[in-house]
Amino acid sequence: MYEGVQVSSKLEQLQGLLAPVVVALGYQCWGIDFSSQGKHSVLRIYIDKEGGVLVDDCAIVSRQISGVLDVEDPISTEYTLEVSSPGMERPLFTIEQFALYAGEQVRIKLRSPFEGRRNFQGLLRGVEEQDVVVQVEDHEFLLPIDLIDKANIIPTFD
């Protein structure tokens, strides 16, 4: 996996390059994830739209994004491009997305320990400035958004 600032700058570069393409096609760019394990890298682009995303939507976006990536060549290593909907276990990338899903159960993994922990699972209470508020059992944690590596909604079936 890329480390710290390198990840942030690579993601910012990809976001700036690819999000406008997704938006121009009529979709919301929900988020971008770029991960690398050994020699294999994966670029995941999550798209959304009113009424949901179909396989054809992913194919349309994938073709356009592939063209941009071929021309701009922002990734120097081999990688796999994946375009998908956020799905039921929707990943959360921005402070606005965390605010939108307040009241939902979440799973959060941090880049480095916070109060002795890296993994949190509990109720997303909301946001306070640049902190995500999560209640785990009877304890509330204010997690700095910059420390969050991955966060997903945990679907509940009532």
From Swiss-Prot:
From what superkingdom does this record's organism come? Bacteria
As for subcellular location, the record says: Cytoplasm
Record keywords:
Cytoplasm, Ribosome biogenesis
Q: Write down the CDD domains for this protein, in alphabetical order.
A: YlxS_C (cd01734)
GO-annotated cellular components: cytosol
A family per Pfam: RimP_N
Note the coiled coil stretches, chain numbering.
Answer: none
Q: Where are the transmembrane segments?
A: none
User: Could you provide one GO biological process annotation from this protein's UniProt record?
Assistant: translation
What the entry lists under NCBIfam families is as follows: PRK00092.1-1
As for what it does, the entry says: Required for maturation of 30S ribosomal subunits.
Per its UniProt record, what HAMAP family does this chain match? RimP (MF_01077)
Protein family per UniProt: Belongs to the RimP family.
Task: Write the protein's name.
Answer: Ribosome maturation factor RimP
The source organism is Pseudomonas syringae pv. tomato (strain ATCC BAA-871 / DC3000)
Task: Identify the taxonomic lineage of the organism of origin.
Answer: Bacteria, Pseudomonadati, Pseudomonadota, Gammaproteobacteria, Pseudomonadales
